[in-house]
Amino acid sequence: MRLKIGIIGAMAQEVEILRNLMVEAKVIKMAGCKIYDGKINNTKVALLQSGIGKVSAAIGTTLLLELTKPDMVINTGSAGGLDANLNVGDIVISTEVRHHDADVTAFGYEKGQLPANPAAFLPNEQLVSVALKETQTAGFNAVSGLICSGDVFVNGAEKIAQIRQDFPNVAAVEMEAAAIAQVCHAFNVPFVVVRAISDVADKESHLSFDEFLPLAAKNSSEIVVAMLNNFA
């Protein structure tokens, strides 16, 4: 049986390249989400534009899993780099995903852990391996590691320092991956996060997030398309 791949991006810019590659796509619009159900390079794909933030991502991921039944999920798009080895346009691949803005430590949970859930959501090892292989083949610099999510665009030294204190090995931050991972965990669907860096903490730049975003979308989409060929 041929596999079907779910792909999730938050913003129109993050899914546009992939959407333009799709054929035989039908569009599902529901609850502020858009799902494009079709094919890319003869691989069955369901592409979700979820909207920004963890609630939108959770709604969209649930709809994607229930309505299109993908065998696995790839979360793509942009992220802010916190690992010193990451620069704009580089690729970050999840080895674990956590909420950085959840705190139930008063009841004995780890920082970022929600009750009835693991402290960290672990991606599928095969998907991580495929992502790393295709990133290397494409010649991109890549870091694999912890990706932390929260409903905040992280900038400013104080916020960055707090996240690093709570999660010393954090590689990148963004606003949806932990919600997507939590829904995939609940539905027992394998996932991986493959994003490109749009802005880098602690490094001065005259370029804004908006100027970085097209490059991040291009690079992350290139890796996702290469990954799809492994499941055709």
Swiss-Prot record:
InterPro entries according to UniProt: MTA_SAH_Nsdase (IPR010049), Nucleoside_phosphorylase_d (IPR000845), Nucleoside_phosphorylase_sf (IPR035994)
Active-site residues (renumbered): 14 (proton acceptor), 199 (proton donor)
One Gene Ontology cellular component annotation held by this UniProt entry: cytosol
GO molecular function annotation: adenosylhomocysteine nucleosidase activity; methylthioadenosine nucleosidase activity
Keywords tagged on the record: Amino-acid biosynthesis, Hydrolase, Methionine biosynthesis
GO BP term, example: nucleoside catabolic process
Residues of the signal peptide: none
Entry binding sites for substrate: 80, 154, 175-176
PANTHER family: 5'-METHYLTHIOADENOSINE/S-ADENOSYLHOMOCYSTEINE NUCLEOSIDASE (PTHR46832), 5'-METHYLTHIOADENOSINE_S-ADENOSYLHOMOCYSTEINE NUCLEOSIDASE (PTHR46832:SF1)
Function, in words: Catalyzes the irreversible cleavage of the glycosidic bond in both 5'-methylthioadenosine (MTA) and S-adenosylhomocysteine (SAH/AdoHcy) to adenine and the corresponding thioribose, 5'-methylthioribose and S-ribosylhomocysteine, respectively. Also cleaves 5'-deoxyadenosine, a toxic by-product of radical S-adenosylmethionine (SAM) enzymes, into 5-deoxyribose and adenine.
Similarity comment: family membership: Belongs to the PNP/UDP phosphorylase family. MtnN subfamily.
Protein name, per record: 5'-methylthioadenosine/S-adenosylhomocysteine nucleosidase
Source taxonomy: Bacteria, Pseudomonadati, Pseudomonadota, Gammaproteobacteria, Pasteurellales
